[in-house]
Design a protein with these regions (language model features):
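Enzymes that bind and transform nitrogen-containing heteroaromatic metabolites
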Residues: 3-227
Length: 227
């Protein structure tokens, strides 16, 4: 039992998501970013990784001013649950999302007491959920979100490390890939961290179910085909 999991990704035409420094604002257009707000608005929770929090300090909220008019005029937009995968409990208690209304849940594989106390005081709920490799147990985390928080749609907005881990675990049901008409070169970061792929036979097949223009960008909807 787990939510339907949708991964939102932004990339250049040559498949890059950020500069080597981590700079990624903005690859895609404002139209694409408005479209992402619709994905957030329909999601019960938004998940990211500690690396994204440290690099970007995201709000992880639905920004109503950026929604299309028909959604912006809705009586109320419920803010999604914020979820952070933080293996080493490195997220600062001063993170911007912890100053905003709504709940934040942090899954960790670290039993360090001091950062947990600080994050608890900041209003987050820290859940210790390690697997055998001393990383966060991602399937168990998704199951807990469904059973304890009644999350039925989970949106992932994160970097290549967590995106790759979720894909390798068979936990991504759908990808929304926003492709910008720019080239970023080879000294940049890719979409997924998939270290075990050494030959073409080990590729991850996808089914493309929709492609459409969003402003100057293209939105590709794809579903992984798991063996």
């Amino acid at each position: 039992n787990r939510p339907y999991i949708r991964s939102k990704l932004g990339m250049s035409l040559d498949g890059r998501t950020a500069m080597a420094s981590g700079e990624s604002k903005w690859i895609t257009s404002q139209d694409a970013r408005r479209d992402v707000q619709c994905l957030r608005a329909r999601s019960s929770a938004i998940m990211t990784g500690a690396g994204t929090v440290l690099a970007d300090d995201p709000q992880m909220t639905v920004r109503e001013a950026e929604l299309p008019c028909e959604l912006e005029a809705a009586p109320s937009i419920k803010q999604p649950l914020r979820v952070v995968i933080d293996t080493h409990l490195s997220m600062p208690a001063e993170a911007r999302m912890l100053t905003l209304p709504g709940e934040t849940v942090i899954f960790t594989a670290s039993d360090s007491k001091s950062p947990k106390v600080m994050l608890d005081k900041a209003g987050a709920r820290v859940i210790y959920l390690p697997n055998r490799e001393r990383e966060v147990d991602l399937p168990a985390a998704c199951q807990l979100l469904a059973e304890e928080y009644e999350v039925n749609e989970l949106l992932i907005e994160t970097g290549a490390t967590l995106s790759g881990a979720m894909l390798r675990a068979g936990l991504i049901d759908e990808m929304k890939i926003y492709m910008a008409p720019i080239l970023m070169g080879n000294k940049t970061r890719g979409l997924f961290d998939l270290p075990n792929i050494e030959c073409l036979d080990q590729h991850f097949p996808l089914e493309i179910v929709d492609i459409r223009a969003v402003g100057r960008d293209w939105r590709i909807t794809a579903q992984p085909i798991y063996a």
